[in-house]
Amino acid sequence: MIMAFYDLSKQERLDVVATISNNILAALRTSLLKKIAAYFGDEDTYIRKSAYLSVGRIYFFHKGLQYKIVKALDALLLNDNFKIRQTVINSAGEIGKIDFKNVEHFFDKGLFDTHHASRNAVIGSIKKMGEVNSGPVLHWAKNYLHHPDKEIRREICHGIELRGRKYPQDILPLLKELQYEKTARVRSTLVHVIGQISYKKGCLETVVGHLKTWENKQIVADAFEEIIDVHYRYRNFSALTEAQAAQYIAENYPEDYKKK
């Protein structure tokens, strides 16, 4: 692309997106990966995004191509260009919003990619898939909660956060499995996620209720401090004020959590 995507007018952008989609569809029908790879590896982030969104739409609108699409993504995942691998993972994330089983293996591989961009694409995909297709995604994520690699544990913890913002009850049992985490960076992410799933309407009650069942009082204390702080930082968006959150915790948690 000669001009950057957002240098174009709105109509020109729509035309580019349509062209990308049509070209990818034609390439999939003929199993020509070169054209797809060109879009997947484009320097412009928005071109790559248009490409993976197109793959997701094609997968569901052209069911006869689903096998070919997965095989094409399998082949492209072997490419040396990290941008192409990253876009493969994002494409799988679009598909996994509905059909996770068919693309699960992309995330198994992507978690261990040598480039952080591909690993970050796994986190982003877990977030967007988990928001709308939580059952199989959280079941998959649970398998990695105790992985020997601390970065894998951290990425999984981070990835399930978005689902928890609306439905904290869905991810709290998974977070509980990390309550005795010894690695500071993973523990910090755990506390951060607990804070992030606490500030919307009705969520604090769910979170505090579940934290009552945790045995590690130190991590619970850290989580409560983060929850109160989040209610201050997000004061324009949170259901309760900082003071109300602190009062609710004090009234509903059976112990003085500040006594560490």
Where are the regions that the model predicts?
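Eukaryotic acidic, Ser/Thr-rich intrinsically disordered low-complexity regions
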Residues: 215-260
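Structural detector for internal amphipathic alpha-helices that build alpha-solenoid repeat scaffolds
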Residues: 4-27, 49-63, 85-98, 117-132, ...
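Hydrophobic, aromatic-enriched interface-forming segments
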Residues: 138-161
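Short inter-helical turns and helix N-cap capping residues of alpha-solenoid HEAT/ARM repeat scaffolds
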Residues: 9, 43-46, 80-82, 114-115, ...
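Amphipathic alpha-helical scaffolding segments comprising HEAT/armadillo-like alpha-solenoid repeats
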Residues: 2, 26-39, 60-76, 97-110, ...
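Generic beta-strand or strand-like secondary-structure segments
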Residues: 54, 68, 72-75, 79, ...
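Short, contiguous, helix-prone interaction/anchoring segments in small proteins
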Residues: 35-55
